[in-house]
Amino acid sequence: MINRNANRDRDRSRSNDKELKINYRIKAREVRVIFENGTQEVLSIEDAIKKAKEAGLDLVEVSPNVSPPVCKIIDYGKYKFHQEKRQKEQKKNQKVIKLKEVRMQPKIDTHDLDFKSKNILSFLKDGNKVKVTIRFRGRELAHTYLGYGILNSILEKVGDVNYVLESAAKMEGKTMFLIVAPKFKK
């Protein structure tokens, strides 16, 4: 009978370089073994695997780039579980900051400007950066000072929230923009 899963398992072990080598997959002749109690000893690979099997545990290569490679005698399943748990915890603690964009034109009405500034305020309170963009069309390009006035009035309305002006008002082609970021407490 042909074992069709053997090739799949072998390919899986080759493709995943991040996975640690365990037991018979370790290719070194000699290894530095760290036992569960913390003591170290340099052993041949056969003796190290034999001691791991006697303890009912696995020989796991932790540092392959050292001569001789460093291996630990531990339960590989538990070790892998704790590694994954630690990675999930780190991922959960990361704060993802998104860049929100608020677009307007230089001939915006005061009510619309109030509405847009409330949106900017809520984005900043949520912890997101905000890119405020003013798009000029046609003859409006001759009156860029209107754009600077609008951006300054928005910054005044948002003034009660702690924010950092990440990029001052710039003109790029037909658009004027500035980027505002929330100020985080450390």
From Swiss-Prot:
Subunit structure of this chain's protein: Monomer.
GO molecular function list: ribosome binding; translation initiation factor activity
Q: List where in the cell it is found.
A: Cytoplasm
Gene Ontology cellular component list = cytosol; membrane
Swiss-Prot/TrEMBL keywords: Cytoplasm, Initiation factor, Protein biosynthesis
**Key word Protein biosynthesis present:** yes
Gene that specifies this protein: infC
Function, in words:
IF-3 binds to the 30S ribosomal subunit and shifts the equilibrium between 70S ribosomes and their 50S and 30S subunits in favor of the free subunits, thus enhancing the availability of 30S subunits on which protein synthesis initiation begins.
In which family does this protein belong, per the annotation? Belongs to the IF-3 family.
Q: Primary place of residence? A: cytoplasm
Q: Which organism is it from?
A: Borreliella afzelii (strain PKo)
Q: What is this protein called?
A: Translation initiation factor IF-3
Gene Ontology biological process: ribosome disassembly
Which Pfam families does this chain map to?
A: IF3_C (PF00707), IF3_N (PF05198)
